[in-house]
A protein has these predicted regions:
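Flexible, P/S/T/G-rich "lid" or insertion loops adjacent to the active sites of thioester-utilizing
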Residues: 159-182
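Non-catalytic N-terminal regions of enzymes
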Residues: 1-161
Length: 182
């Protein structure tokens, strides 16, 4: 990797910038009321990856470009306090651009912002936690705000919404009218 992309999970990551710029990794912390069982967490994570294929990607650098590539290896789960990867380029992450770790009653998901925004990763984490609770034997269900792992995946979920911005009426000039509106 060049000096333009130093993939660190510890807040020292800078994409196309220097140490004075913002980090490109975010963390979602989920606190549960019981201690986390890594066996159930690993199983829930494996099942969640089938519902969220858009985050099953890694990064490869060639010439002057960085390109996403599909990753199909198991997603590792790390216990906080034990040696963990500090870079997204660490081989222990199996090529993924996110890290899942836990400590007592807390679940941590660190991810590269090129992978998804907070809304997209929050949908993944909610589905992961719901499945974890189901595997743990709790009678939980969703009110519709959590994507079920059995739900259908739509291609638009993995697309950049900014690319569809031109289709929105608000991005058209004031004088623009749609003939179907009348």
């Amino acid at each position: 990797m060049t000096g333009y992309l130093v993939p660190s999970l510890c807040g020292q990551t800078y994409l196309y910038g220097s140490h004075a710029d913002a980090s490109v990794s975010s963390r979602i912390v989920t606190a549960l009321t019981m201690h986390i069982d890594p066996t159930f967490l690993t199983q829930a994570l494996a099942e969640a990856m089938t519902r969220f294929p858009q985050i099953s990607v890694g990064l490869v650098e060639s010439d002057e470009r960085r390109t996403f590539i599909p990753v199909s290896a198991d997603v590792p789960v790390f216990r906080v306090g034990e040696p963990m990867p500090q870079d997204f380029s660490d081989s222990r992450l199996n090529g993924y651009l996110f890290r899942v770790s836990y400590c007592h009653k807390h679940l941590y998901v660190d991810y590269h912002r090129a992978l998804a925004d907070e809304v997209g990763m929050m949908a993944f984490v909610k589905a992961l936690v719901l499945r974890y609770l189901e595997l743990s034997g709790f009678p939980v269900r969703t009110d519709g705000s959590v994507k079920l792992l059995s739900g259908e995946y739509f291609k638009a979920e993995g697309e950049d919404p900014m690319l569809r911005m031109e289709d929105a009426y608000s991005s058209k000039p004031v004088w623009f009218m749609v003939s179907n509106a009348f």
